[in-house]
């Protein structure tokens, strides 16, 4: 018996010790919660008062309560219920706050509370400070409190939280009202959530699955837990921020529908105004919209939006922000919207923006930044005026060229094989490369008839309208659409400052909304004769050859037997005219007049491998083979690389890597990184100068293939000097023009979406007729706008040791078309090129068609 009594005494002692420690723990929890709500100083005062009152209450209890009274047990029961309830509540709050045993889900940390983060739009700016694009998951640009209209603040407080300035995050009176409404069945008691609680929910996503614990999935209990989190977070927000800061965060966080987040974007999207310019009725519309962005959307449901706006106005009257007369007057007004919703590819420079996005995403992956959520400010290199000029030039000249192309083919199909015969299965073959075909083939794997049916099924669609540079509605099938788009010529243009590498204009196509493929960097096509300068640079710069522009090579047929991939081949290029002078010709003249035979002979002398080496040194990054025809540009290159490589000539032989972005700032305006281009000496300064003179000869001297830019466009102001090189590939599949000035290197490419789509005659399809007009029109606009000042190339600061002043004798300007794999069959002569002085207007630019 004594053993049993001892055992029970031990258990009682342990229980008392546990109860004592539990009481201490509960006291600590209660103290922390009280500190959280009231602050440490106030909590100390309360707990000191509590201890004194507790002692006094105990003394009073012992002196006045009769333990034998019939009321003693009920009083004790009530008292214990209160005490245990408080203890249970304290334990519950502790578990929620600490996510005890992962039951309750996470709470925002102190760092989260002090530096709340919302997804912000990243903005792209031009070199002259104009914003040209925003990229985001949520289109949001925060504004400070001073840029928020007082009308918005009044409307929000009157509608959502009338006692906002009198509570500390939780409106107990409103909560009691809601509770009473639940008991009585009343439905007009409001929601009870304060503005601060709503902000807590929006900022920290307290109801998302990631914030739930194990108990969060229990019906009813889950609601209680996330509500508790919002209460606790609201209290913390009130302790960390002023009322103005809370309102500012709220307005910058709210979703206003139509992928519009924050009051700044909402004001601009719905009313084309800054948020500090919103009047009462506009403010009421936006505050009312917060309740349900679909139901009360003024675009989708004007009637419901108007009703909701008037509810907000009535609340403003109720709480004294408006007089009854003002409220009645405003309520009678209609909602007048002036919508302008932003998309990432609004405006111009869309191909450039896409290139910037690719660059920043890669940079962000390496540096821990997200383009779509971190509110970056990205400062780019393009000049807004030059970009506009470039797009206008592209639109104007391609519209004219497309008219010529349509007239040229009339009712015939333009897809032709190398012999000029129509490719009869062209569209059925091409359609198999489309996503539409792949989707249908997957849906009907063994049913080609069904695939064909849906490909030829007509429906209303919106397509690109090249005649008006816009869009048009057509009742077409997918095959009709493919047929239409394949007939449209494509183009790209890029302009770069050769000294800084800064890209000043980038036009990757006709319209980004319809032609996503970027002809500047993504597109790679044969450069034709624009590749020839690499041959001449090799001959002049490489000390093994040490040639000069006045050295001569006989213009005669060239033939080369060589081996490629184990197979013996014979290459016999022909001149574009199909004729030869059989006389010595200077390198200067040969390049200016784009003589294929001389280039082929020079390539043979310097070696194809050396030409490849120099092309790589100067910036060509695509694969090149050391074959005899390398000098005539048989391998695909990008316009981007070609512009960079030609920049070497204008930058004293130094290759400067093209750059798109100069610096990136964070959302607070702090510079994260500044970008500088790579520089390397590719060729000597003297070689660069000599090549520049040779390129000038192509523009300035008789017979030069680029000469038309001087008399067709006003680009020689102020003694302006240009160097240029045209290029045209076999069958006129590609037209190129590369132009060098003292401040800009500009390149353009024109061709069909497929190489089999082209002009039949060099007279219409050569680079001088397709690509050169785009560059000429661009430079004319740039000089007219005074984006840059025209002028001569700077004189060399060093002695020129080689002879270069051997002007080309007068000769008819030849085409630059290549017959890379052809024989010496004469080509059709371009009659228009016979006129070098005062030539007649070229139909390409002067024809007027409706």
What is the predicted role of each segment?
Residues 2-125, 163, 183, 401:
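N-terminal type II signal-anchor transmembrane helix
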Residues 230, 234, 238, 290-308, ...:
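Active-site loop and adjoining helix of the penicillin-binding protein/serine DD-peptidase-beta-lactamase fold
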Residues 165-175, 261-264, 323-328, 541-565, ...:
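Short, well-structured active-site flanking segments
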Residues 2, 6-9, 16, 27, ...:
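Peptidoglycan glycan-strand catalytic modules in the bacterial/periplasmic cell-wall system
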Residues 188, 323-381, 385-446, 579:
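Non-catalytic structural connector segments
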Residues 129, 156, 199, 246, ...:
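Residue-level preference for non-acidic, small/hydrophobic
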Residues 184-211, 276, 340-351, 546-611, ...:
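Conserved catalytic neighborhood of penicillin-recognizing serine enzymes
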């Amino acid at each position: 018996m004594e053993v049993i009594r001892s055992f029970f005494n031990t258990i009682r002692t342990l229980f008392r010790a546990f109860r004592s420690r539990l009481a201490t723990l509960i006291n600590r929890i209660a103290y922390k919660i009280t500190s959280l709500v009231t602050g440490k100083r106030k909590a100390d005062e309360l707990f000191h008062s509590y201890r004194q009152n507790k002692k006094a209450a105990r003394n009073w209890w012992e002196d006045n309560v009769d333990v034998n009274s019939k009321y003693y047990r009920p009083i004790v029961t009530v008292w214990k219920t209160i005490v245990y309830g408080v203890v249970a509540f304290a334990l519950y709050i502790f578990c929620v706050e600490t996510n005890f045993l992962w039951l309750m889900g996470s709470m925002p940390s102190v760092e989260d509370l002090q530096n709340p983060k919302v997804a912000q739009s990243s903005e792209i700016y031009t070199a002259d400070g104009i914003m040209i694009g925003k990229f985001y998951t949520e289109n949001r640009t925060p504004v400070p409190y001073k840029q928020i209209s007082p009308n918005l603040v009044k409307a929000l407080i009157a509608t959502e939280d009338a006692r906002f300035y009198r509570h500390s995050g939780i409106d107990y009176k409103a909560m009691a009202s809601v509770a009473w409404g639940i008991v009585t069945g009343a439905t007009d008691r409001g929601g009870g959530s304060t503005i601060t609680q709503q902000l807590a929910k929006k900022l920290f996503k307290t109801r998302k699955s990631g914030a739930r614990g194990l108990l969060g999935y229990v019906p009813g209990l889950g609601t209680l837990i996330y509500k508790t989190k919002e209460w606790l977070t609201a209290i913390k927000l009130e302790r960390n921020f002023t009322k103005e800061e809370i309102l500012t965060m709220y307005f910058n966080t709210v979703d206003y529908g139509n992928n519009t987040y924050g009051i700044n974007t909402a004001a601009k999207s719905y009313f084309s105004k800054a948020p500090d310019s919103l009047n009462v009725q506009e403010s009421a519309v936006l505050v009312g919209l917060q309740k349900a962005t679909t139901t009360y959307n003024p675009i989708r449901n004007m009637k419901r939006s108007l009703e909701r706006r008037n509810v907000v106005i009535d609340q403003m009257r109720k709480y004294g922000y408006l007089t009854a007369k003002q409220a009645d007057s405003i309520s009678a007004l209609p909602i007048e919207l002036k919508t302008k919703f932003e998309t990432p590819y609004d405006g111009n420079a869309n191909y450039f923006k896409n290139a910037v996005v690719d660059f920043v995403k890669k940079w962000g992956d390496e540096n821990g930044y997200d383009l779509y959520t971190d509110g970056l400010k990205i400062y780019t290199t393009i000049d807004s005026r030059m970009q506009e000029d470039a797009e206008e030039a592209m639109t104007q000249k391609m519209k004219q060229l497309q008219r010529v192309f349509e007239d040229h083919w009339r009712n015939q199909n333009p897809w032709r094989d190398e012999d000029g015969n129509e490719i009869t299965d062209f569209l059925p073959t091409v359609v198999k490369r489309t996503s539409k075909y792949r989707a249908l083939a997957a849906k009907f794997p063994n049913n080609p008839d069904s695939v064909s049916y849906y490909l030829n099924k007509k429906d209303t669609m919106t397509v690109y309208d090249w005649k008006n540079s816009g869009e048009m509605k057509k009742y077409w099938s997918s095959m009709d659409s493919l047929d239409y788009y394949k007939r449209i010529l494509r183009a790209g243009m890029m302009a770069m400052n050769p000294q800084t590498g800064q890209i000043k204009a980038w036009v990757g196509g006709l319209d980004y909304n319809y032609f996503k493929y970027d002809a500047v960097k993504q597109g790679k096509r044969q450069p034709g004769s624009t590749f020839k300068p690499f041959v001449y640079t090799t001959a002049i710069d490489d000390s093994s050859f040490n040639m000069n522009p006045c050295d001569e090579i006989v213009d005669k047929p060239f033939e080369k037997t060589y081996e490629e991939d184990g197979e013996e081949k014979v290459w016999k290029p022909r001149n574009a005219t199909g004729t030869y002078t059989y006389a010595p010709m200077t390198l200067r003249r040969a390049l200016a007049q784009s003589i294929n035979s001389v280039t082929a002979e020079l390539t043979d002398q310097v070696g194809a491998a050396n030409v490849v080496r120099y092309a790589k040194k100067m910036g060509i990054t695509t694969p090149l083979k050391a074959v005899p025809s390398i000098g005539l540009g048989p391998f695909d290159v990008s316009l981007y690389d070609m512009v960079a490589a030609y920049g070497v000539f204008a930058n004293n032989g130094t290759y400067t890597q093209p750059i798109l972005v100069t610096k990136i700032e964070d959302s607070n305006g702090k510079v994260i990184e500044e970008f500088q281009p790579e520089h390397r000496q590719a060729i000597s300064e003297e070689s660069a100068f000599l090549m520049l003179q040779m390129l000038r000869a192509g523009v300035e001297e008789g017979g030069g293939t680029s000469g038309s830019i001087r008399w067709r466009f006003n680009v020689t102001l102020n003694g302006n000097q240009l160097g240029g090189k045209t290029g045209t590939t076999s069958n006129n599949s590609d037209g190129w023009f590369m132009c060098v000035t003292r401040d800009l290197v500009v390149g353009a490419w024109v061709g069909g979406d497929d190489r089999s789509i082209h002009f039949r005659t060099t007279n219409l399809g050569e680079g001088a007729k397709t690509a050169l007009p785009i560059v000429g029109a661009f430079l004319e606009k740039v000089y007219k706008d005074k984006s840059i000042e025209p002028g001569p190339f700077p004189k060399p600061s060093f002695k020129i040791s080689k002879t270069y002043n051997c002007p080309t004798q007068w000769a008819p300007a030849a085409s630059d078309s290549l017959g890379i794999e052809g024989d010496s069959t004469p080509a059709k002569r371009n009659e228009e090129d016979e006129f070098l002085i005062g030539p007649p207007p070229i139909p390409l630019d002067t024809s007027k068609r409706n």
